Amino acid sequence: MLSTRNKRIGTVVGAAIITAVALTGCAGNSSSDSAAAGSGSGTWAKTEGTLVFGATPDQAGSDSNNKPLEDYIAKETGYKVEYYPTSDYTALIAAAVAGKVDLMSSGALQYVMAQNKGAELSAVAATLTSADVTDPGYYSEAIVAKGSSITSLADAKGKTVCFVDPNSTSGFLFGLYQLKQAGLSVDSTGADANGNPTFADFTAYFAGAHDKSEQAVASKQCDLGFAEDSVVTPAVAKGEVTSINKQYVPGGPLSISTTLPDDVKTKLTSVLQGATLDAIKSSGVTLTDGFTKGYFGAQKEADDYYAPVRDLCSSIPAGKCAK
């Protein structure tokens, strides 16, 4: 039976229990507040008074897609915000581990992997995926080309399967979980020339982005593939692909550096937890088409919300995300 949006991933991994911890924060500060750097001890990724923002490059135009949120954070905190460009998921994780970002918008898997590698980050909120939901979770969907003879994940054996990236939450880890549930072996048998994992029961192809995974399936470059629901839903509506399975995934975290001065962390936490779409629109920042199509606000969440992802990492070694 498919998961419903209100059925959190804790049920997927059995004993995992999600505890949403309310973080204490004071009221948001507007741009009229002093832009002075935070007081007390702490370190910044680049320079005092500048927040460096890292984001998952999972679709084309990621910088433009995140610009309104960056501008909103700058306006509400009084600090300068700079975007840290990364070419792929691995680069974002490396930047977080190296302490080159002060805040990060990512998938749950990148967050967990970065922490496991030593990144000093803590989630304070999770992003919503639709205007009509209050749960930040979303779905990893299994898709086939329109008219495909494949009707279940069990049919994927011996086929070419499109994934997004080995470090993708919904585009890889939760795709492997769905295949495992269908009876396929998801134990890696080695690595290809690019260092990506290989499997005995199917041929893995890594498209590099969610939209590219969908496009590869639609063009029949792959027999089956995985992508997040925000990409799949419009593709299904256009008649490009058919969704044959889906699995709930904890929403992508907005995380902040734990090394920032305490007052900066408090201010930034308050701003991120209050970053609704209405609040951003009302602030007067310029919106972009990519942003309004993909950002629907954030909900307060904490690190414990992602405990089930860590459990799934432990049960699927090919994910290479266990600590």
Place the predicted regions along the sequence by residue.
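Short beta-strand->loop
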Residues: 121-135, 236-249
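Sec-exported extracytoplasmic/periplasmic mature domains
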Residues: 74-78, 97, 116, 148, ...
